A protein has these predicted regions:
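Alpha-helical transmembrane segments and their membrane-interface junctions
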Residues: 54-76, 126-144
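Transmembrane alpha-helical segments that form the membrane-embedded catalytic/substrate-channel core
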Residues: 15-23, 78-95, 149-175
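Interfacial segments of alpha-helical transmembrane regions
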Residues: 2-12, 66-81
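Interhelical loop and helix-boundary elements at the membrane-water interface
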Residues: 43-44, 89-117
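Juxtamembrane helix-capping/reentrant segments at transmembrane boundaries
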Residues: 30-51
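Short, highly charged, low-complexity non-transmembrane loops/tails of multi-pass membrane proteins
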Residues: 164-193
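Hydrophobic alpha-helical transmembrane segments in multi-pass integral membrane proteins
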Residues: 116-136, 189-190
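Core segments of transmembrane alpha-helices
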Residues: 47-64, 114-124
């Protein structure tokens, strides 16, 4: 029954992770949209609608996966967790390079703490569990493919379907990136509030 528990923990981590990206300190959209080459980092390609849809799809997938449990689902969760760690690392490096001349001293960006502090340990625990229980190569491959399919369903497809340079759902607060106004290309944030 540990597989279901670990999958449940993954979705609790998702709530913590999204809270860091959106609110504490918030501003994940700035780094994500910068990585995607946006000239309007408050709304394109990620806006509040696409980001909320991503989380809704991920949680819906959780409602399906938790009861199923099993090794393939656990490997999919591990792949997703590693995707988060790698993604936040790459975005952090990019933002550090762009903003070091403006005083940025680390690769931290919204979501990095929970990616490293929660998702990375979860991925390691799942990998150890998978090895310990003797999961076969086929399960590993199917799990990784399932994880990639989940990323496509939760992130890529909603963004492709709903992105809009003139979105009516822009972010209204740059969060962490308020301290780096140079990062806020094309955004219409109330910076004096």
């Amino acid at each position: 029954d540990w597989d279901r528990r670990l999958i449940g923990i993954a979705f609790i981590i998702l709530a913590v992770h999204v809270s860091e990206e959106w609110y504490f300190p918030g501003g994940f959209h700035v780094q994500y949209n910068t990585m995607r080459g946006s000239s309007r980092v408050d709304r394109y390609p990620m806006d509040r609608l696409t980001d909320s849809t991503t989380v809704l799809v991920a949680m819906a997938l959780g409602l399906v996966f938790i009861p199923l449990g099993g090794g393939i689902i656990m490997i999919a969760i591990m792949a997703f967790a590693l995707f988060e760690v790698i993604g936040h690392t790459l975005m952090g490096i990019r933002m550090y390079r762009d903003l070091a001349i403006h005083g940025k001293k680390t690769i931290y960006g919204p979501g990095t703490t929970s990616a490293y502090g929660l998702y990375l340990p979860l991925a390691i625990i799942i990998a150890c569990y998978a090895v310990h229980t003797g999961m076969g190569v086929g399960e590993w491959i199917l799990g990784i493919l399932c994880g990639l399919a989940c990323v496509a369903a939760a992130v890529i497809i909603p963004e492709l379907a709903m992105r809009n340079e003139n979105s009516l759902y822009p972010y209204t607060d740059p969060g962490y990136y308020r301290r780096y106004p140079e990062a806020l290309r094309g955004a219409a944030y109330p910076l004096n509030s």
